[in-house]
A protein has these predicted regions:
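N-terminal charged segments
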Residues: 1-84, 97-98, 102, 158-160
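Conserved acetyl-CoA-binding loop-helix of GNAT-fold acetyltransferases
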Residues: 71-79, 192-197, 201-218, 237-241
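Conserved beta-strand-loop-alpha-helix junction that forms the acyl-donor binding cleft
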Residues: 92-99, 226-236, 253-259
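A short, internal acetyl-CoA/4′-phosphopantetheine-binding micro-motif in the GNAT/acyltransferase core
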Residues: 57-67, 193-200, 229
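Conserved N-terminal entry element of GNAT/NAT acetyltransferase domains
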Residues: 2-5, 33-42, 122-140
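Conserved GNAT acetyl-CoA-binding A-motif
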Residues: 83-94, 216-227
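A conserved beta-strand-loop-helix scaffold within acyl/acetyltransferase catalytic domains
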Residues: 156-197
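Conserved beta-hairpin
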Residues: 1, 34-38, 100-108, 163-179
Length: 260
C-alpha cells in the first residue's frame, strides 16, 4: 500500500516513498491491459505501443524491488513472459531507488532505450488562461481530432481505462496542441503533451499546461507531475520555467538481444 504524502509536491516523506508514490500514480493512471507479478515486480502487458504499459515496474524495497525469485531467475522469467507475448522485455527503473538493479541489467546486456526526468509542481490558484488568439477546449474523452494529432489511436483503449481530462489548443479552428491529465486523490499526471512544431515558441505549451492543471484542480488535485525525455531540452526548459522541479530520473532498459 502506498501511504499518502504531504501536500507540497516532491517534499516531506522519505525519498524512496515519494518515488514509489509517483510511480504508482503513473502506473494507475496509464493502466496496462494485463498485469502479471513476480513478487513485487509488476509485469505490465499491453499491445507494445507504449513502454510504460509494456514494461516491468519494481515496487518493493531496494536494491532489486523484491521479486520472489533469485534475481537471475526473476530476470529470465521476465524475458520468457514478454517474449511469449511477442513483446520486447523492458524494465522501468526509477533512480536512484533501483540503481543496483539498473546496473545489474546493464552488466548483462540490457541497454537504455530512454532516460527521462520526473518533474513535479504545485497547482496554484492563479492560472492565467486568457488568450486572444487561441481557444482552449477541455473534454472528458479523447476525440477523433485529439487522437489524430499524434496518431494516438492505438493508445485510446489504455487512456479510456482511467478517467482523465483531454486538453486542446485551437487556432483558427485547427487543433495545434494537445495533452492529457489524470487525477488520483490530490495528485495528477500530465501525459501526451504535444505542440505542433509550427507553433512552438509562442507560449502555447505553457498555456496548454495551465489549462490541464486547471482541469485537474477542478477534479481535486493540488499537485501535478509529468515525465520528460532527458534529451528534450526545450521541454525541460519550458516546464522548469513554469516552476516544475526535478524529482527523480528513470531509465527504460530493454533486452538488447531479444533472441535470448
Amino acid at each position: 500500500e502506498i501511504r499518502p504524502l504531504p501536500d507540497r509536491a516532491g517534499t516531506g516523506a522519505p525519498f524512496s516513498l515519494r518515488i514509489q508514490e509517483l510511480e504508482h500514480l503513473s502506473d494507475l493512471t496509464w493502466p496496462a491491459d494485463e498485469i502479471e507479478e513476480i513478487g513485487k515486480w509488476r509485469l505490465r502487458i499491453s499491445d507494445g505501443f507504449t513502454m510504460r504499459a509494456n514494461s516491468v515496474l519494481p515496487t518493493g524495497a531496494a536494491p532489486f524491488g523484491e521479486p520472489n525469485l533469485d534475481i537471475e531467475k526473476a530476470v529470465d522469467e521476465v524475458v520468457k513472459i514478454y517474449q511469449e507475448k511477442g513483446l520486447t522485455p523492458t524494465f522501468t527503473l526509477p533512480l536512484p531507488l533501483y540503481e543496483e538493479l539498473d546496473n545489474y541489467l546493464g552488466d548483462i546486456g540490457w541497454g537504455v532505450k530512454v532516460g527521462a526526468e520526473y518533474l513535479v509542481n504545485d497547482i496554484t490558484d492563479n492560472l492565467d488562461l486568457e488568450s486572444a488568439d487561441f481557444q482552449i477546449v477541455i473534454s472528458t474523452e479523447p476525440t477523433l481530432e485529439w487522437l489524430e494529432v499524434q496518431s494516438d489511436h492505438q493508445l485510446e483503449r489504455i487512456m479510456r481505462n482511467y478517467p482523465a481530462r483531454y486538453g486542446q489548443i485551437k487556432f483558427e479552428n485547427k487543433t495545434i496542441a494537445i495533452g492529457r491529465i489524470a487525477t488520483f486523490g490530490k495528485r495528477s499526471l500530465a501525459t501526451r503533451v504535444f505542440v505542433n512544431p509550427e507553433f512552438r515558441g509562442k507560449g502555447i505549451g505553457a498555456l496548454l499546461m495551465r489549462a490541464l492543471m486547471a482541469a485537474a484542480k477542478g477534479d481535486g488535485a493540488t499537485k501535478v507531475g509529468l515525465q520528460v525525455d532527458s534529451e528534450n531540452g526545450a521541454g525541460l526548459a519550458l516546464y522548469k520555467s513554469m516552476g516544475f522541479r526535478f524529482h527523480h530520473f528513470y531509465n527504460y532498459r530493454v533486452l538488447s538481444d531479444v533472441s535470448k
